UniProtKB/Swiss-Prot annotation:
Source organism (scientific name): Pyrococcus horikoshii (strain ATCC 700860 / DSM 12428 / JCM 9974 / NBRC 100139 / OT-3)
SUPFAM superfamilies to which the protein is assigned, alphabetical: Ribonuclease PH domain 2-like (SSF55666), Ribosomal protein S5 domain 2-like (SSF54211)
InterPro entries in alphabetical order: ExoRNase_PH_dom1, ExoRNase_PH_dom2, ExoRNase_PH_dom2_sf, Exosome_comp_Rrp42_subfam, PNPase/RNase_PH_dom_sf, Ribosomal_Su5_D2-typ_SF, Rrp42_archaea
NCBIfam families per record: PRK04282.1-1
Protein name listed in UniProt: Exosome complex component Rrp42
Location in the cell: Cytoplasm
Lineage: Archaea, Methanobacteriati, Methanobacteriota, Thermococci, Thermococcales
General function of this protein: Non-catalytic component of the exosome, which is a complex involved in RNA degradation. Contributes to the structuring of the Rrp41 active site.
Top-rank taxon, per record: Archaea
């Protein structure tokens, strides 16, 4: 057994013993998030942006838009694409190069949470049906990784979309020309999906796992919900099995915690407009 494995084993035993006593390594309750700070509109050249600090985890999201063609199978819908970049400076486990499995999973779950909740109304992003639509790029940069990137990215992405202002577009049916105006308008964001992630350590579930907790967890479960009572994404990761009662508890808790986080997001958006 290597020294790293010995240290990991000691850390796991310590965390599990604390959990059995009703404590966490950073003194939070099992359902408590670390402090959440949200600042929007901080990238001048982006159409929308948000910096989210979840404890020491930091994520920056920028929104850019352009006009393009719709996908052939969805001619009456705009296009949304999500990309996650794990900056090597954020963690010694991040390496330069194309997106790895972690980045791909983070992007897919974030995209699914927004898309399946219909948070961004893609139908309202159509300029000319079947020909010209608005294309939205959600670009995520992880600046510091101290656990629970899934929630930090999801929160930052929806905050950046809410912050976005894009040029108005007019289509002249007679000439077939599209004019991009100087006047700007918000994106058609109609719901606020929020992911809530649980780590299973031993037989105990904790919300918003820190990096230390992630290193020893047996499984991970993310539940994304919106304010209408819908679940738009569920993602299980890191192996491990979840009992039905654990999943039901996670769903119930996810709705409750998402409501709290949604208020923080809306307060940040309101503050930016003052």
């Amino acid at each position: 057994m290597s020294d790293n494995e010995i240290v990991a084993g000691i850390m796991r035993d310590h965390i599990i013993n604390l959990l059995k006593e009703g404590k966490r390594i950073d003194d939070r309750g099992f359902e408590d998030y670390r402090p959440i700070e949200i600042e929007v509109g901080i990238i001048e050249k982006a159409e929308g942006s948000a910096l989210v600090k979840l404890g020491s985890t930091q994520v920056l999201v920028g929104i850019k838009t352009t006009l393009g063609e719709p996908f052939p199978d969805t001619p009456n819908m705009g296009v949304m694409t999500t990309n996650v970049e794990l900056v090597p400076l954020a963690s010694p486990t991040f390496e330069p190069g194309p997106p790895d499995e972690r980045a791909i999973e983070l992007a897919r779950v974030t995209d699914r949470g927004i898309r399946e909740s219909r948070a961004l109304n893609l139908e309202k992003m159509v300029i000319v049906p079947g020909k010209i639509v608005r294309v939205v790029f959600i670009d995520v940069h992880v600046l510091d990784h101290d656990g629970n990137l899934m929630d930090a990215i999801g929160i930052a992405s929806i905050a950046a979309l809410l912050n976005a202002k894009v040029p108005k577009v007019e289509y002249n049916e007679e000439t077939g020309e599209v004019e991009i105006l100087e006047e700007k308008e918000p994106l058609p964001v109609e719901r606020i999906p929020i992911p809530v992630t649980f780590a299973k350590i031993g037989n105990i579930l904790v919300v918003d796992p820190s990096l230390e907790e992630e290193l020893v967890m047996d499984g991970r479960l993310t539940v994304t919900t919106d304010e209408t009572g819908h679940i738009s994404a569920v993602q299980k990761g890191e192996g491990g099995a979840f009992k039905l009662e654990e999943v039901m508890y996670a769903v119930e808790t996810a709705f409750k915690k998402a409501e709290e986080i949604r208020k923080i997001v809306l307060e940040a958006i309101k503050k930016s407009g003052e």
